[in-house]
């Protein structure tokens, strides 16, 4: 079947992974990828010709009624559907054309963490195998060793101003997708309004919001898009002193360093594996309980 474009459907953290996929599918496979709001199908009941589309539904639990309905209707509109979930008993996989398991084991935390990194790995493997680069499996096997044996500094919580609850997390390319997930965790766990922005979009207007009592997290990845973020640092330093660089450069002032695997896509997994333990410590340092985020439940039902 000739696939000419990809549609992703997801919510929350899974949608951040879907955004990530849009970059790597377009970059490596030349396939335009669009994140479809589930309500377009479930509430608006819009019709599409999906005969040349691959529809990828990402859901940790696979239980949200809107995502189950989106998969069913997408198939009826001619799509080949792929389900990425962590639940092998999910009703969403019964009729889908393909099922890709996250293999994250049970995730008890309310805020999704390891299912995000596992979803990234599934997406990365899918892309590289489509390119005929099956040796990506060997590179992935080395990841756990890199993460576990990382002797670099553990991110400290005391370098971040806990009294400032607003700011931006700025990235570009896959870094922007990761910025969306990082932003979500600041909101879910820390009750901080850290908004994600592309570094290019910030320059088009939102930088006007920046003042000295404003946090700026700058996420630099080892790819062409990430380099542009690093180039913006000097200008942004004119607007606030609260700048925190997340980088593979061990000399960054803010000490938010993560080691590089030399494959930018896999660097994403290393970075998030470093971020998640830190955000737990940071949340605790603020006097909040990361296992009991306010108003949230493990499975969110929407339609």
Task: Report the location of each language-model feature.
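Acidic catalytic cores of enzymes that act on phosphate-bearing nucleotides/polynucleotides
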Residues: 163-232, 239-242
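Short, flexible hinge/linker loops that cap or flank conserved catalytic cores
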Residues: 48-49, 160-161, 210
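Glycine-rich phosphate-binding loops that contact phosphosugars or nucleotide phosphates
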Residues: 2-146, 152-153, 172, 207, ...
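Active-site-proximal catalytic alpha-helix in oxidoreductases
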Residues: 117, 121-124, 177-180, 271-276
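A short, charged, Gly/Pro-tolerant segment at domain boundaries
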Residues: 141, 286, 290-303
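Structured C-terminal subdomain patch of bacterial secreted/periplasmic proteins
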Residues: 252-289
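Conserved phosphate/anionic-ligand binding catalytic regions in large, soluble enzymes, centered on
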Residues: 20-21, 181, 185-188, 272-277
